[in-house]
Amino acid sequence: MIRKRFLAGLVTASAALLAVCGPSRAVADLDDPRGHASRANDLTVSMDYDKARAELAKADPNSPAVILAKARLALYEEDCDLTAALLSRADVGQQDEGRLLADVGRGCARVTAATIVDKDDVNGIVIRYQDGADRTLTPLLVDTVLKARTSLTRDLGVEWKRPTRITVVRDLLSLSAMTGLPYKAAQTTGTVAVAKWGRVTLLSPRASHHGYPFRDTLAHELTHLAISMQTRDRAPLWLHEGVARREEVRWREPGIFDERPSVESIVARGIELKLDLALDKLGPSIAMLPSADAATVAFAEVTSFIKYFAETSPADALPRLLVALRTAKTADDALKEVSGETLSQWDVRWRANLAKHPKEPLSPMFGLGAMPPGLGDSRERSRLAELLVGRGHHAEALTELEKIPAEMLADPSLRYLRARVLEGTDSAKQAEALLDDPKLWTASYGPCWAVRGRLARARGDQPAAEVSFGEALAHDPFGIESACQVLPSAPNPPLDRLGQGAPLCETARKRADPDLGRE
């Protein structure tokens, strides 16, 4: 059993790397008296690339500010080699902004040197894969982009510029190189995606054991791109992250885990642990906070605040706020223009509302604070049970699992293990009862959904099976149980039963992850 911060241990870093990645207006003002570079930067972050190019054509080509603007535009259009070449000039490349752009340009060039590109010209989507084994994700990624763009247009008034660019990378080093997010920060907070430079860079689900909710993560990051376009990259971090967390689930039907645990309960626990921060003191990125616990609490704070703002304001308040940020001197000015109150005034109202929420228990399995009692012993017993399963001793494995306290079954990885053991002892009914109510799980978990789907199909409940396998694929698309809908030791089902999932099954088989206890 692995103690996992299921809700926010995998942090989606964002375009809100504001302090280190935004264009420097001070430099532009010094050697760009006509403002061509500044206007081009605004057009670039708004993804109006043709207009940005036209603006730069009017400018002095030797101006450092203009060269920086051209390098930025090239990076947004994925011409990483051109970015690096433009910044080879010493007086440009040695500026702070120039060094950052040059580093990202070189990193991007290395990562994308041998990538495979899938283009959907009809829908305006370009997906670049560092590893060809991830290409079978394309149908799921395209479907997510289309639905997320529609929901973001509905909620935020976004007019999407095409194409929407996505790069899928194989590891955190590549994620860091492509985006400028420090590798150490990505490791500390468990970052799996970054929206910056006009694209979403997404870590392959293959990089994480049993994947992660990559479809919601993609919707989250697309929200950051939408906010950057609408505000010309002038949105504060609390707005970026709060709106992205709100929107990451609005592209699909509501799910069982969308409000579990409630963000208010996480904030309350964070306050007890002194992990909370003022909304305007979050730093340049949540992905750069000192720990995953701190990131969890920060995400909960901004999510709760934006939820309160949206629910107590007119329906068009968020779209109007994004537009107001384009020209307002500060975020406070924009907020006051739209709502009549500043952030500090809203903060007082939000915290007063927060205090009215009844105290909710937060499962110790969630990950904030002290480790639950008995965790070490439970981990050892679960590992022993896995090894016994791998050698065909299911009854003995069940004996070990029965010694683990029942409250530990909130951990879905342990619940999955017990369900697999029950399957192996011909106790399908007990396994069904164990997985029947996902509300008993701490968080959504692909393998649990896969077993649930398999059991539902065996008893003839096809609708429940389809829902369960859909959830399994959304989290663990390269797991054999999710993609092939069978045990790893079983032959593949008929391909027509898998439908569009057949290529994922083939990829999962080629990956050949060992089954329980066979590592």
Each model region followed by its residue ranges:
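Extracytoplasmic/secreted proteins, especially bacterial periplasmic and envelope-associated proteins
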Residues: 35, 39, 51, 82-85, ...
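Long amphipathic alpha-helical scaffold segments
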Residues: 76-126
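Sec-exported extracytoplasmic/periplasmic mature domains
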Residues: 45, 57, 61, 75-78, ...
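Beta/coil-rich, acidic/histidine-enriched accessory regions frequently appended to metallopeptidases
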Residues: 27-59, 82-89, 293-297, 323-519
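N-terminal secretory signal peptides that target proteins for export/translocation
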Residues: 1-4
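Bacterial Sec-dependent signal peptides at the C-terminal "C-region" and cleavage site
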Residues: 17-31
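Juxtacatalytic substrate-recognition/specificity segment
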Residues: 114-237, 247-254, 267-276, 280, ...
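Bacterial N-terminal signal peptides
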Residues: 9-19
